[in-house]
């Protein structure tokens, strides 16, 4: 009788991670357990043994001439070269937030840089699809005729900046919401690298290769952010696209360079 009683108690008292739960656990308990599991998976170290990009012996910002890294920069995450003069990563919460912002901005910058250069490259090689210079193409929506996507009026003919804004907010917001919320069932444990349908090519299947791809993504993303900043400055100063500016510089580097434009730049002209 005692044995059957204890066995029925064991069956009616499920456990989660070694902790006994009630028969009808509250949503708060399950939510806390799910959050704990997601948090532990998110903060799991990605450093791989023998990788030159992770760990205490990783590549530093000045190579062999680098000073001692701050104690909080352990080489656990990609893109950590042991340099943080301003102490932006000292607080773990701030570091986690800034790390996410950097990765997301890197991805947008890489897409943006490609979008600024590729149409102009095609146009200079005989492919015609309307305005090719990135900032001039976007401004066409304010013209009387509106903006034709890819120069084709039958594709998307945009005449309202508010409609474009609303469409982007809905489409981009839906994807971002899916990523941040961890998917409809909470199956995504790392919102920065969600995998699944966000990785149709299976690039994250090999942990070693995936760890290296994270470093490559950040390195290229940081370059892309600097590139986008340069494209903005070029657009303001010269009124030309990046490839046209490059061609002008190569044709006459003495008169077409950053110094000559900086000394002769007059705002509004």
Curated annotation (Swiss-Prot):
Binding site residues for chlorophyll b 3: 160, 176
Binding, chlorophyll b 5: 168, 265
InterPro entries in the cross-refs: Chloro_AB-bd_pln (IPR001344), Chloroa_b-bind (IPR022796)
Transit peptide (first-last residue): 1-37
Signal peptide: none
Sequence positions that bind chlorophyll a 6: 249, 258
Modified positions (N2-acetylarginine) in chain numbering: 38
PANTHER family: CHLOROPHYLL A/B BINDING PROTEIN
Family: Belongs to the light-harvesting chlorophyll a/b-binding (LHC) protein family.
Domain-related comment: The N-terminus of the protein extends into the stroma where it is involved with adhesion of granal membranes and post-translational modifications; both are believed to mediate the distribution of excitation energy between photosystems I and II.
Name listed for the protein in its UniProt record: Chlorophyll a-b binding protein AB80, chloroplastic
UniProt organism field: Pisum sativum (Garden pea)
């Amino acid at each position: 009788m005692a044995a059957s009683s204890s066995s029925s108690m064991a069956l009616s008292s499920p456990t989660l991670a070694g902790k006994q739960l009630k028969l009808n656990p509250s949503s708060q308990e399950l939510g806390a357990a799910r959050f704990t599991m997601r948090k532990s998976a998110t903060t799991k170290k990605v450093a791989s043994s023998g990788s030159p990009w992770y760990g205490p012996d990783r590549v530093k910002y000045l190579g062999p001439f680098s000073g001692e890294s701050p104690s909080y920069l352990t080489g656990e995450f990609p893109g950590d070269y042991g340099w943080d003069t301003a102490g932006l990563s000292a607080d773990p919460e701030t570091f986690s937030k800034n790390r996410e912002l950097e990765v997301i901005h890197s991805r947008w910058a890489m897409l943006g840089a490609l979008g600024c250069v590729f149409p102009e490259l095609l146009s200079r090689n005989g492919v015609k699809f309307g305005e090719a210079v990135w900032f001039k193409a976007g401004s066409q929506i304010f013209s009387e005729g509106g903006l034709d996507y890819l120069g084709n009026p039958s594709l998307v003919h945009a005449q309202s900046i508010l409609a474009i804004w609303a469409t982007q907010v809905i489409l981009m917001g839906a994807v971002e919401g899916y990523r941040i919320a961890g998917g409809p069932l909470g199956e995504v444990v790392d919102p920065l690298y969600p995998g699944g349908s966000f990785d149709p090519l299976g690039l994250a299947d090999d942990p070693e290769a995936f760890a290296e791809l994270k470093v490559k993504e950040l390195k290229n993303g940081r370059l892309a952010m600097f590139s986008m900043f340069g494209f903005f400055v070029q657009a303001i100063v010269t009124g030309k696209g990046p490839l046209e500016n490059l061609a002008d510089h190569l044709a006459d580097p003495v008169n077409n360079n950053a110094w000559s434009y900086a000394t002769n730049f007059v705002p509004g002209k």
